[in-house]
Amino acid sequence: MEDYLQDCRAALQESRPLHVVLGNEACDLDSMVSALALAFYLTKTSEAEDIFIPVLNIKRSELPLRGDNVFFLQEVKIAESALIFRDEIDLLALHQAGQLTLILVDHHMLPKSDAALEEAVAEVLDHRPIEQKYCPPCHVSVELVGSCATLVAERILQGAPETLDRQTAALLHGTIILDCVNMDAKIGKATLKDNEYVEKLEALFPDLPKRKDIFDSLQKAKFDVSGLTTEQMLRKDQKTIYRQGTKVAVSAVYMDLEAFLQRSGLLSDLSAFCQDHSYDALVAMAIFFNTHNEPVRQLAIFCPHEALRMTICGVLEQSTSPALKLTPIPSISAHLQAYLQGNTQVSRKKLLPVLQEALSAYLDSMRTPAGQLEAALGMSREQADKELDKASNSLIAGLSQDDEDPPLPPTPMNSLVDECPLDQGLPKLSAEAVFEKCSQISLSQSTRACPSNK
């Protein structure tokens, strides 16, 4: 693959049309490997001898934040210098010059900042439900499996298995195992197809690492935050939610929260992080494993604005859908509230609707006479929880369990920043809304009938 990647870089210097395989903005291991393996395969099988260029959808400077990516590249002997990052290729200029064909892998929807590139998208390969209300006007292959690398492996082995070398097989094999939590049936992340293609890769290359060995190594590398600054730790796996001008960062922190709170200069680091990125609040979701290898989840809410902080904390403490079962942890600052999260099944994805409710409650309080906020929350809390539960269920109806985070630390998922159904708040439970949701579910299910290019 090294020679191929050198050819890709050389192609960037030529004035010629380019085929780009673009991973998602999280650039997790699945996204990186899927882009590399699919582009390599398409280049090898191109009848016109076109070159397909894999592009990692982050800046080169951000790669060190993804420890499992860095570790695996070293493990399979691919030099970081050979890779092409988003800040090293001007996709917009290529598109405006009519020289860009884009293939999306491990995502199916471009962020608003890339809206101008939509016309260049020729194919989509993803493993999560279609969020748009229409089938993109291109070849679309979407299947709900644990890892997009599974779909890439399927594409290769069904199309031209003779092109698969051990290096690419090792990349796909390790990625599927990490994404599917070592194929553990109790976790429920791996589908039959994930298991099928892991077994096929192992049959073709019997010297691939043992599953437990590669899973343990990748997971250790993924959650290794030693040497990272506070800002790097917060940016390593971060989502952002907005609500009428209020902006909240939601970051996964892969260590014991109590140890995190003892970091030197932490409060000034948190303040600088929020100020530099214009966040009104920061929610840190800590997760680590105890001595019994059981997941432990903790929460910290940092917010200098007392009203916003109290509203977020109040909604989280009172939430029953889901019930977080929070126990306060002694705080190091009046601007920070920390908790032990008793319900470890509540992942970030499941917490986001609750945080959206908190932002709505805060914004409502800005329009509510002083002293009435608590009464408003308390008076309708039970009803509000029921309505939130119904609304959340209506939002995820039609999605498979595969799209939910596992009860272990998840790999970074596609960004929820842009075009998320929750960005505009929870829907009103009217007859029209129910009808609209049913229509969306039907469209989502019908995407299986869209043409795919295998």
From Swiss-Prot:
The reaction(s) this protein catalyses: diphosphate + H2O = 2 phosphate + H(+)
Binding residue positions for Mn(2+) 2: D30, D106, D179
Pfam name, any one: DHH
Superkingdom of origin: Eukaryota
MF terms in GO: exopolyphosphatase activity; inorganic diphosphate phosphatase activity; metal ion binding; phosphatase activity; tubulin binding
Enzyme category, top tier: hydrolase
Identification of the protein by name: Exopolyphosphatase PRUNE1
Protein encoded by which gene: Prune1
